[in-house]
Regions:
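Short, well-structured N-terminal submotif of metal-dependent ribonuclease cores
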Residues: 1-41, 54-61, 134-138
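Acidic, PIN/NYN-like endoribonuclease modules and their adjacent C-terminal/linker elements
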Residues: 3, 72, 105-138
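A generic structural signal for short hydrophobic patches within well-formed alpha-helices
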Residues: 11, 46, 83, 119-120, ...
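Active-site-proximal, substrate-binding regions of enzyme catalytic domains
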Residues: 26, 53-74, 81
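General small-molecule cofactor/ligand-binding pocket signal
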Residues: 40, 76, 128
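Amphipathic alpha-helical segments within well-ordered protein domains
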Residues: 47-50, 70, 87
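Active-site neighborhoods of divalent-metal-dependent phosphate/nucleic-acid chemistry enzymes
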Residues: 74-117
Length: 138
């Protein structure tokens, strides 16, 4: 089974139907229905997705969209240890990206799917965009 961390930008693309990336991002999220994939995201990514969904669709609709996501995606932990790892790694300049990385790592993820791959320049986990992930893993 592949454990896959979904970054906030992929979630935002799906909840706001942002083209041209929407099709590939939606296909990646649909893999949660297949037994060989386990999808994860962090509370931070969900908060970011909610913020942008709420701006576009309003609070009520944004909550509905996130609840649908949660039917398919597991939530990683972001606790004291994760935050401290991100803060203590001198190679990490953006603490939010560091928290995403360490929460993915603590959940055993072997891929991070992000359209901002350069944000994870420090990652020992393979970081791929949606299209590349679909081409590699299907």
């Amino acid at each position: 089974m592949k454990q896959v961390f979904i970054d906030a930008n992929v979630l935002v693309t799906v909840v706001n139907k942002k083209y041209p990336l929407f099709s590939d991002a939606a296909k990646v999220l649909s893999l949660a229905d297949r037994s060989e994939f386990e999808l994860f995201t962090s509370p931070v990514c969900l908060a970011i997705a909610f913020y942008f969904a709420e701006k576009k669709s309003g609070t009520s609709q944004a909550k509905v969209k996130l609840k649908l996501l949660l039917d398919h995606i597991k939530i990683t932990r972001v606790d004291d240890k994760i935050v401290r790892q991100a803060l203590n790694n001198a190679a990490i300049h953006d603490v939010e990206d560091g928290m995403q990385y360490y929460s993915a790592q603590s959940s055993g993820c072997t891929y991070i799917v992000s359209e901002d791959k350069d944000d994870f320049y420090f990652s020992e986990i393979k970081v791929v965009g949606c299209k590349e992930f679909l081409q590699t893993c299907l």
